[in-house]
Amino acid sequence: MSILIIEAFYGGSHKQLVDLLQEELGDCVVYTLPAKKWHWRARTSALYFSQTIPISEHYRTLFASSVLNLTELAALRPDLGKLKKILYFHENQLIYPVKKCQERDFQYGYNQILSCLVADVVVFNSVFNMESFLTSMGKFMKLIPDHRPKDLESIIRPKCQVIYFPIRFPDVSRFMPKHKTTHLKKMLGLKGNGGAVLSMALPFQPEQRDSEDLLKNFNSECDTHCGLDTARQEYLGNSLRQESDLKKSTSSDNSSSHHGENKQNLTVDPCDILGGVDNQQRLLHIVWPHRWEHDKDPESFFKVLMHLKDLGLNFHVSVLGETFTDVPDIFSEAKKALGSSVLHWGYLPSKDDYFQVLCMADVVISTAKHEFFGVAMLEAVYCGCYPLCPKDLVYPEIFPAEYLYSTPEQLSKRLQNFCKRPDIIRKHLYKGEIAPFSWAALHGKFRSLLTTEPREDL
């Protein structure tokens, strides 16, 4: 157990990374705190861990997320301070969008800067995360009234590197509707590294025209799609089976307390909805798979959906993602307002159920005001969803320009077109790359990072 992993906020992508490293690297011991009350974890977890983690001569590397105040832990536990200390940034607090700037907010970003000074290696999950942190330090430190420290960026930058968040993409072939099989073939290899292997290049069919061109010209092309009736019928039949399987799986899971909330998340019977759909056109299925918190800007998302309804456009929506202590009021209001448009509502603890919903969806939306990577968006794209993301934050680093929007009005316009012609995006093949973000591509970097030779003074 030479690798000591500490996670002060064991939930979401933080949990996903810890679990992956523990399973794949083996020689690890893990200490965590539940993903509750983030601000209190950032303030107090170092003292808790200093009293909880036993002294061991076997530790060589300490890996922690930036929620932990590494400076406090190293001071409280000099034996841990001597280890090779790796600090991983899922997000940074220097540009966090707060509703109201309060003096206490300064401490969270300040603690992250101090932790970087103590760490031996500082790793970020994206270039955007790293650069936004390093280039914001000067402005951030000007909040100090006087006697400000200097040259922090030049001290910290040499320690920094980017290793993208590693996603272990599962085999979802059993969940894929027929119209996504071409997408699946482009994405998947057969095996390797305990999971699906992705082709390092994701080509699309030469005859596949840009979806924007199709949208501009769809009225003149209607005649060219008259031969799709049989394919659509096959797709609808397959989709009905997939929805039915999910319903049965959820019903079975209700016998377990772990999955006890799943039943309420199936707001309506999917088979009842799909059974009445004209075989010529299944309604567009929009998915929003993010944390139910204000920094993901659910208000903007639901405002766009309500505008679609006001225009008389029909669609289905699945609102997934984890909830924490405080859930914004907009969620209960939106659920009532969206009514029969809702297909799934709430967190799905079962990964199979989660990926099955993604495979059945057509479009995945982000309206985030705070995003440094976006695991859920990439998982949805892997499952064949067409992504629509803000032209901001980390998204231009990950997604081609076609999938970015600049304003809520642009997002609404794109969705209006998709609601009218969902078949256009169902035959679209993603033009970006998924492979660089897979565990298959990144495991070597993490192994090298975490299993390097111990320091000479240990």
From Swiss-Prot:
Predominant cellular place of this UniProt entry's protein: cytoplasm
InterPro entries named in the record: Glyco_trans_1, GT-like_domain_containing_1, QTMAN_N
Subcellular location: Cytoplasm; Nucleus
EC numbers on record: 2.4.1.110
SUPFAM superfamilies the record matches: UDP-Glycosyltransferase/glycogen phosphorylase
GO MF entry, a single one: tRNA-queuosine(34) beta-mannosyltransferase activity
Biased composition regions of type Basic and acidic residues, renumbered to the chain: 242-262
Catalytic activity, as annotated: queuosine(34) in tRNA(Asp) + GDP-alpha-D-mannose = O-4''-alpha-D-mannosylqueuosine(34) in tRNA(Asp) + GDP + H(+)
UniProt-listed GO biological process terms: regulation of translation; tRNA modification
Broad class of enzyme this protein falls into: transferase
A Pfam family the protein falls into: QTMAN_N
Keywords: Cytoplasm, Glycosyltransferase, Nucleus, Transferase
Domain of life: Eukaryota
GO CC list: cytoplasm; nucleus
Region spans: Disordered: 242-267
Organs and tissues of expression: Ubiquitous. Expressed at high levels in the lung, brain, spleen, testis, placenta. ovary, pancreas, spleen and peripheral blood leukocytes. Expressed at low level in the colon, small intestine, kidney, skeletal muscle and thymus. Expressed at high level in colon adenocarcinoma.
Residues in coiled coil: none
Family recorded in the similarity comment: Belongs to the glycosyltransferase group 1 family. Glycosyltransferase 4 subfamily.
Function (record text): Glycosyltransferase that specifically catalyzes mannosylation of cytoplasmic tRNA(Asp) modified with queuosine at position 34 (queuosine(34)). Mannosylates the cyclopentene moiety of queuosine(34) in tRNA(Asp) to form mannosyl-queuosine(34). Mannosylation of queuosine(34) in tRNA(Asp) is required to slow-down elongation at cognate codons, GAC and GAU, thereby regulating protein translation.
Name used for this protein in its record: tRNA-queuosine alpha-mannosyltransferase
Taxon lineage: Eukaryota, Metazoa, Chordata, Craniata, Vertebrata
Designated gene of the protein: GTDC1
